Amino acid sequence: LSVEDGGIGLSAYAMTALIIAMQVGMWFGYVMFGFVSDRVGRKRTYIFYVLMAAALILAYTSTRNPIALLVLGPFVAFFGTGSFSGFGAVTAEIYPTEIRATAQGFTYNIGRLASAAAPWVVGSLAETHGFASALSITSTAFILAAIFWIWIPETRGRELR
């Protein structure tokens, strides 16, 4: 979109470069989460990732500089989507074998159900308050996730039951 319409005013070429850079950051975020969480723990890694995502999204949505967007984009994707790598490991390690598959499916799909509303919510808010304000709500969701994870037990090194 043009700047006048609330967009960032990038050409199709520049937007493609931005998306590719973000996809690369995403991939590294997914991969690195496993290595980092094996070293320092699932809980600390997850909380760090989502708090970094919250901060970076606020920085990302407050700039219109194409170079800054290109530099910040991969880091937003690294932390914002890299945190999802933790769900499989943590849910496998928290639930006993007898209910593991059901519990993983339930928790995963509750998240999918909640996130199904995201395009509508972000679109509606963007229409009334602009894209930056709408996407900033994502920061709030990441902060709430960090708070919620305070009560999730650390599972690094835990034997499956």
Predicted regions and their residues:
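Transmembrane-helix signature of 12-pass secondary carriers
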Residues: 1-161
